[in-house]
Amino acid sequence: QLGDLQTVVVYRDRIASVRADAAPGDDAVVVDGEGGTLLPGLTDMHSHVSDWDMPLYLAGGVTSVRDLGNDNGMLQDLVTRTESGATMGPRATLSGFLEGRSPYSAKFGFVVGDLPAALEKVRWYADHGYRGIKIYSSMTPDWVKPVAAEAHRLGLHVSGHVPAFMTAERAVRDGYDEIDHMNQVLLSFVLTEGEDTRTPLRFTAVGERMSKLDLGSEPVQRFVALL
């Protein structure tokens, strides 16, 4: 059930108040809502934006997006154009894609072959206005802890897939603030040693084996307690 008609006061880029008795000032711009329904802006917390979908976000009521990995040149150009008003689109919070080098490497962001290069790219992201990094599946597990430590030193959020041959528990202990995708958590409890999550197994193993997982088992409960 909808409430009574209200007046929404916007000051600069923020909603200042929602009241039934707000009187507009002499210099206020008044937009007649004509008895319609107003929703707060929605946020897409896991996106990979592109030129064509930015206006569609606004059309769907999404006013903020969190981009979790993209082509860095394209993304920076798109955000610059959006913030200047040259392109319509939501506000974007950026996390930089960081991948290890392997035959399975994803091709966006930075693909690194050693730890010094990984740390250098973390610093690049911090210097270019990114709010976090997203670690991907081919990252060497032993690099995660120093990479996360450097990211945190620079005030960056750390998220990502769980690298192949690493458990979700170790990823959290080594510095992850967030694991992207629920399958990346569940794989730790249904895989056998040596199985490679850089393959379609990261999808099929969860679908085929989850029904046999005991959620009360010690590994699952230990992980829940860790969180």
Spell out what each predicted region is:
Residues 33-39, 49, 53-170, 174-227:
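Divalent-metal coordination cores built from histidine and acidic residues
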